């Protein structure tokens, strides 16, 4: 009887093992099986992909190809190898535009993120009327950049000099837009004024995502407001900071409308950005030359973005 029972247990155990092995093999087969793509997903994706290819990818590729030619935008052309690229790197005006654009973008992204981060902390604290204040601070988002530029241009050219004259402040008695050494500061101020609201909204979302219990525990441990900012708020919003830095720097590299409305690249060429030089070059008939300039600018922007992401990889996560 004992022998029969033992054989039954052994047989059942083998069956269980065989079933497990069969299931494992089936799982392995399922694991090797390629995932099926939902046809509905493809149906929604395909139109967007086609439009993106026709509107973005194809023109970009054609522009890169034409940058190696002497094309004027129409008619016949011939390939000129690296002639346009050599001309771009040897053009002092283009190099000046790159230096201005990079310097302006760096200063502006620091100013915008510093102010927006501090405002986000203030507007998520226990103060009265913070909802109304948030609405006020995001108003510049709905105003066109060129309109903002024209309004500030009037202020810098008329109101500010008049006020400086009234109080006897000599350095601002003349319009700073006419000063080659100070005009860039006006562009930074106006660009920051328009860019802070969108950056602020992202920071508010980041600060509100931090559980209140974390601050309560820190307060019980005797952490000061500064210590909570440095040890809790900043680290836990690092992902949002990264997003704002990358997106902001990219947007400032492409600045155009505010610069046109304020200085139109002047005085002289002291505030001419790369985007402005490319646009003016197209209007002047330097089609292939500015295509080379645009290609170089695109590569620089991508390299900067990759460096930013790699430098912060593993340190920030939403």
Residue ranges and their predicted role:
Residues 37-318:
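A structural signal for multi-pass alpha-helical bundles of membrane permease subunits
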Residues 1-45, 128-130, 309-318:
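Transmembrane alpha-helical segments of polytopic membrane transport and secretion proteins
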